[in-house]
Regions:
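Bacterial N-terminal signal peptides
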Residues: 9-19
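Soluble non-cytosolic domains of exported or imported proteins
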Residues: 35, 71-79, 146-157
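N-terminal "mature-domain start" segment
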Residues: 25-50
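Alpha-helical membrane-embedding segments
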Residues: 17, 64-67, 166-167
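Bacterial N-terminal signal peptides that target proteins for export
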Residues: 1-10
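Low-complexity, Gly/Pro
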Residues: 11, 23-30, 59-60, 98, ...
Length: 167
């Protein structure tokens, strides 16, 4: 019995010492009637919202939201997202706008990126629209400090890799 306890303690210590080791939770977008699923780190502050999910990194330098949108209303959804960013004191520098096609796990859409600033300094901001069905799509809202983006690059890659349409 003492040998088993030692092994359990050794394993627990090893797991606790692993850098970046975090359990993650999957969310369906929206819930119910899912068209997509995304997995977010457990150590991020995640909240289910009316049309999806939003999450902020544990160091509070990165914000992501994944929401369902009606494709016929996508212009309104983008405008609403920009208004929401402004309500969070995020200022977008429209002169830095870059737009391009993007494909995430078979979903091809459009991404618009800007430089901006918030109360903490410079930020990177993007809005991405991904059609999933003939009538519904996802809008991804992203805002992060340049340093936060670097520090959370692995988690951000994992989030993007996890975003998949529900078939």
């Amino acid at each position: 019995m003492p040998r088993l306890t030692f092994r359990a303690c050794l394993l627990a210590g090893f797991m606790a010492a692993l850098p970046g080791f975090a359990i993650a939770k999957s969310y369906t977008i929206p819930d119910p009637g899912a068209i997509a699923v995304v997995t977010l780190p457990d150590d991020w502050d995640t909240t289910e919202i009316a049309k999806g999910v939003e999450s902020k990194s544990d160091d509070e330098t990165v914000y992501v939201a994944v929401e369902v949108t009606e494709l016929k209303d996508v212009s309104k959804a983008i405008a609403d997202s920009i208004v929401w960013l402004k309500s969070q004191d995020v200022e977008i520098d429209r002169s830095t706008q870059k737009q391009g096609d993007i494909t995430i796990n078979g979903m091809t859409g459009v991404q618009v990126k800007w430089d901006g600033k918030d109360e903490d300094g410079p930020t990177h901001v993007s809005l991405t629209v991904l059609p999933v069905t003939d009538s519904k799509g996802l809008i991804l809202t992203y805002w992060a400090s340049p340093e936060g983006e670097k520090d959370n690059l692995k988690a951000l890659g994992t989030i993007i890799d996890s975003l998949k349409p529900v078939k």
